[in-house]
Amino acid sequence: MIIMGIDPGFAIAGYGIVKYEGNKFTSVDYGAITTESSMELPKRLLVLYNGLKEIIEKYRPEAIAVEELFFNKNIKTALAVGHGRGVAVLAAAQSGIDVFEYTPIQVKQSIVGYGRAEKTQVQQMVKAILNLPAIPKPDDVADALAVAVCHAHSYKMISYGL
C-alpha cells in the first residue's frame, strides 16, 4: 500500500510517501512544498495545490493521511493553516483518493506508543521505522511521514476488524 502523509500549512506543507507491505515500511519520497511570504494568500494556495497534485499524480497513493489541526491560542494562524489543509483535502478528493485524518495525539500514540510524546521522540522513531539516514527537515516533513505511518498502523487494525 502506498500512503501519502501531509502536514498541512500554507508557508510550508510537508509531505511523505510511504510504502507499507507485510509489516515493512519503506520511504519512497518526502519533502516540503514552500511558498514565499511575499505572495498573496490565493497564490500561495495555488502553489500548494499544484505541488500536491503533481506529487499525487506521480506516486498515485492509495490513501492520503492528513494531520488534523490543533490550535488553542492563535486563531489567525489556525485559519491560515486551515486554508492549506483545505487545499490538501481538495487535491486528494479531486484525485479520487480517500482522506484519513489523525490528531497529533493519535499520531504520537501510533509512532511512539505515548500520545504526549515530545516532537523529538516522534522524529527519532520516524527515522528508525523508515530506516532513514537522518531526521527529515524541516519538521513538517517528519510530521508528514509520521502521519503516513500512523495511517498504516490504523489501516492494519481496521482491516483486522479492531
Swiss-Prot record:
DNA-binding keyword on record: yes
Catalyzed reaction equations: Endonucleolytic cleavage at a junction such as a reciprocal single-stranded crossover between two homologous DNA duplexes (Holliday junction)
Matching PROSITE patterns: RUVC
Coiled coil regions, renumbered to chain: none
Molecular-function GO terms, alphabetical: crossover junction DNA endonuclease activity; DNA binding; magnesium ion binding
EC number: 3.1.21.10
Localization in the cell: Cytoplasm
Active site residues of this protein: D7, E67, D140
Signal peptide residues on this chain, from the entry's feature table: none
A Pfam family hit: RuvC
Protein name (Swiss-Prot/TrEMBL): Crossover junction endodeoxyribonuclease RuvC
Gene field: ruvC
